[in-house]
């Protein structure tokens, strides 16, 4: 399939970044799944028309999705910078660190990759909060809510909540099955995931967030080698392996945001067919222009 060519930006830096996003299939644009074509180099995906008896719900849904999109694209750029900018940064200057002789990685650029993974993973539970709000769910307290349990009745994970039981929304079902890759509290769900690398990704994220994840340069002899300098407390990874895991987490976040957008659009189509127009509160929302993003 051939598409018309479009500009990727004004500067070489912008063009290189957008070309990388295209090649890694990271734009929030379904056309990017068809290939690295310049027509897909824009994050056009949004919720579409959202209706409601109260305008506040419309503003909340659109605003929440806006925020998640902004966090995603920011994580994407941080990952890109962390992967390709290997020049020392002035913020690291005169920060005393000790050499543990196992080729550790300590730098602002490496932290960008760590931050990108944290930001990507934080989107999943925010999506759960969005689902809870949009579908008027109250069976799980907000402080216990996550992408793995939002679908179920409060007493267990073997019965779907009434809002989802038999619900014919294929994008929502896609999001449900994607959540199986992200179960943090059940080995059963992760090990039966369709993604064979789901457990490694989950465990790495948990160690990054709650423990001691140590990155190493390629010269490191590896975690299984006998060494008296072995760091037994750390979960150790080669820098390149962690970078690949961070990229995978960003791709999952992209998929989740796409599924969510398509799911809400389907819900709104059904709502339009079944609700009396007089009960709806029409609300016209314009675009937030690029020059306002300061």
Can you say where each PLM-predicted feature lies in the sequence?
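Charged alpha-helical initiation segments
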Residues: 1-113, 226, 274-281
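Alpha-helical structural motif
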Residues: 13, 57-60, 64, 71, ...
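Long alpha-helical rod scaffolds of large eukaryotic non-enzymatic complex subunits
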Residues: 57, 64, 241, 245-294
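Amphipathic alpha-helices that form helix-helix packing interfaces
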Residues: 61-64, 68-85, 116, 120-123, ...
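Eukaryote-specific, cytoplasm-facing alpha-helical/coiled-coil scaffolding segments in long proteins
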Residues: 95, 99, 141-158, 226-238, ...
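Short non-catalytic regulatory patches outside canonical folded cores
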Residues: 98-202, 210-211, 217
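Charge-enriched, short contiguous segments at helix-coil
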Residues: 187-200, 204-264, 268
């Amino acid at each position: 399939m051939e598409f018309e060519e479009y500009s990727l930006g004004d500067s070489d830096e912008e063009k290189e970044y957008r070309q990388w996003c295209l090649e890694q299939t990271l734009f929030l644009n379904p056309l990017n799944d068809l290939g690295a074509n310049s027509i897909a180099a824009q994050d056009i995906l949004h919720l579409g028309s959202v209706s409601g008896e109260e305008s506040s719900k419309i503003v909340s849904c659109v605003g929440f999705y806006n925020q998640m999109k902004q966090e995603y694209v920011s994580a994407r750029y941080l990952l890109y910078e962390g992967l390709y900018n290997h020049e020392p940064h002035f913020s690291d200057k005169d920060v005393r660190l000790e050499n543990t002789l196992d080729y550790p990685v300590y730098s602002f650029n490496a932290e960008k990759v760590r931050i990108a993974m944290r930001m990507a993973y934080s989107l999943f539970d925010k999506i759960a909060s969005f689902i809870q709000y949009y579908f008027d769910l109250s069976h799980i307290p907000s402080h216990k809510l996550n992408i793995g349990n939002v679908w179920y009745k409060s007493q267990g994970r073997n019965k779907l909540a009434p809002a989802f039981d038999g619900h014919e929304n294929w994008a929502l079902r896609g999001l449900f099955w994607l959540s199986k890759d992200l179960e943090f509290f059940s080995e059963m769900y992760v090990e039966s995931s369709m993604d064979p690398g789901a457990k490694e990704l989950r465990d790495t994220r948990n160690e990054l967030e709650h423990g001691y994840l140590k990155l190493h340069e390629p010269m490191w002899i590896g975690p299984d080698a006998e060494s008296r300098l072995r760091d037994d407390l750390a979960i150790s990874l080669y820098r390149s392996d962690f970078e690949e895991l961070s990229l995978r987490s960003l791709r999952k976040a992209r998929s989740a945001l796409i599924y969510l957008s398509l799911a809400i659009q389907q819900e709104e189509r059904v709502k339009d067919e079944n609700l009396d127009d007089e009960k709806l509160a029409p609300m016209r929302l314009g675009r937030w222009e690029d020059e306002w993003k300061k």
